[in-house]
A protein has these predicted regions:
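Gram-negative outer-membrane beta-barrel transporters
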Residues: 8-14, 101, 119-202
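Repeated loop/turn-to-beta-strand initiation elements of outer-membrane beta-barrel proteins
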Residues: 11-14, 46-50, 91-95, 140-143, ...
Length: 275
């Protein structure tokens, strides 16, 4: 279940919530985990805001066996903090910057000499900076830019190496055409890229030359306004091509042998209207 509420008081905004999860394992073990979250924002007029967030997530280490072959029942825990600001230098344009720190404790660590035995005393850390810019640059041109830098560390061994992409960038540009046959048509071009990073297995880096490759992907959209008719009002036909050059890439990984591959070249057609 999930409970959450938001409170406004003058220039202050407060958020508090908690999620409860019941977990059951195939070995008939049971655990219940609480995951609270808090947030606070201080507005300075209409153009500047400072914010801070904190959250905790936990879940049992079901599915992992200890040295005696019994299922681990204690829980891993993730604590996350974020601090940042948002500012609007000009109308309809927002820039935001934040620092985040994510610490995982009590994660499963492989026992030396075993292929499927663990103890739950691992600790990992990911910290970094996220920057974003979005809004209307001109009357016809809107832009979205997001960049994230992440530094990861295995606190159990003290090693510092990337287990997720250290640099990630997303960019979207949209332009609306005024006048002519294409009046009202909106063209969009997107770009997504991520750095390479080390593949891991059983919580450890496999080898210096065993990495998840970097990738760059381009997307394109066009939104065409349709003439009004008896059946269609404010109708827009949307055409999209994602991964234009049909790039083969790994989008995300849990570990080296459990990866989510990116979508191949994908075509999408949509119709938006009111009745």
């Amino acid at each position: 279940f999930l409970l959450q509420d938001v409170l406004s008081y003058g220039q202050w905004r407060f958020l508090a919530g908690v999620r409860g999860d019941a977990h059951f394992s195939l070995d008939n073990n049971y655990a219940f985990a609480w995951s609270p979250r808090f947030g606070i924002t201080r507005m300075f007029g209409e153009r500047v805001a400072l914010f801070a967030n904190a959250a905790r997530t936990s879940a049992p280490n079901f599915g992992y066996l200890d040295e005696n072959g019994k299922e681990l029942t204690d829980s891993w825990r993730t604590d996350q903090m974020e601090f940042g600001f948002r500012v609007s230098p000009v109308d309809k344009v927002w820039f935001s910057a934040s620092w985040f720190d994510i610490i995982q404790n009590n994660t499963p660590v492989a026992i030396d000499g075993y292929t499927n035995r663990y103890y739950s005393d691992g600790s990992k850390r990911a910290e970094g900076v996220e920057l974003s810019l979005n809004g209307e640059i001109t009357k016809n041109w809107s832009s979205y830019l997001s960049y994230t830098y992440t530094r990861t560390k295995n606190r159990t061994t003290g090693e510092v190496y990337p287990t997720i992409a250290p640099n990630a960038l997303a960019l979207w540009q949209k332009y609306r055409i005024d006048g002519g046959l294409l009046n009202g048509t909106v063209l969009g071009l997107g770009y997504r890229c991520k750095d390479s990073y080390y593949a891991t297995f059983r919580g450890a880096k496999i080898a210096d030359n065993y990495t998840i490759p970097s990738y760059s992907v381009f997307d394109f959209t066009v939104e065409i306004p349709l003439p009004e008719s008896k059946w269609l009002k404010d109708a827009t036909l949307r055409l999209a091509v994602y991964n234009i050059f049909d790039k083969k890439y790994v989008q995300s990984t849990r570990h080296a042998v459990q990866c989510t591959v990116g979508e191949p070249r994908t075509f999408e057609v949509g119709l938006k209207t009111t009745f």
